[in-house]
Amino acid sequence: IESGNPDVSGYANKIKTHHNDVELVRKARERGLIIETNWDWHKDEVRKVARMLGLDEEIASRQPFPGPGLGVRLLCSDGPAPLPADDRLAAFDSFVENIADGKYFVRVAPINSVGVQGDNRSYKSLATLFPKNPTALRDTDWAEIFAIARAIPNEFDFINGVAYCIDAGDNDTTAPFTCAGMHIGSDVAGILREVDAAVTKNVMNPKIAQCFAVMFPMTATAPQKYSFAIRAVCTSDFMTAKSAVPGVDFTIDALERTVSEIRAAEDANVSMIFYDVTGKPPATVEWE
């Protein structure tokens, strides 16, 4: 459905491309050159069959991995993405101030992320949420944060994702964000591999369907260049998903270890660390 395959639905829009449903494959399918005995299986059904076949749980519960690999988790950029008009930003700030009860403030990041809104693919701004008085992660009111994260995209159509800052580093988070250029290369790929390993090692468990790290070139006043987001979701079929809740779906200790290991990553140049608190929809599982 998300590939917009007309054989599945005459009304579905393309949300993302799947490697087994590109135009070349569709033409081969029309010519009878492809046999797909399990073409309509969802990931949870694939895992169920794997267990029925007696495969090791490590294989049966393996995370999905995008065809382009970590490349879709490196948010490449030639510079900052345009922000919404000032009047829209003012309304946005006022709305969040009201629903956050003065405990949080929100910034629209100069980067775009992929989402799904109204059965269509969206490429819109990311909202970053900051505590006015930072506390230890174990004292964080996650229920309140998730409620704010649900409200923002429902009210503002230029937002399709919300990430909560769990470690601001040396940044003055009220200062303007800067977004330098970043392109895929062995240097940034090596950094992301190390950070992603820390995330999956600590956060992944049987409750979580997928977790990973996202790297993007954004900072405020700190000299470090890169920020990272932790993404962990709970879902059975990946058509919809909820963001895993720290302290419920995985332990706060695991999140604290992850933050410490990201900070310690060699040459990672870490500015800020965020936790993605957005469900699907309005976001997708991946950021790109």
Question: What would you call each of these model-derived segments?
Answer:
Residues I1-E288:
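ATP/NTP-dependent adenylation/nucleotidyl-transfer catalytic domains that generate, transfer
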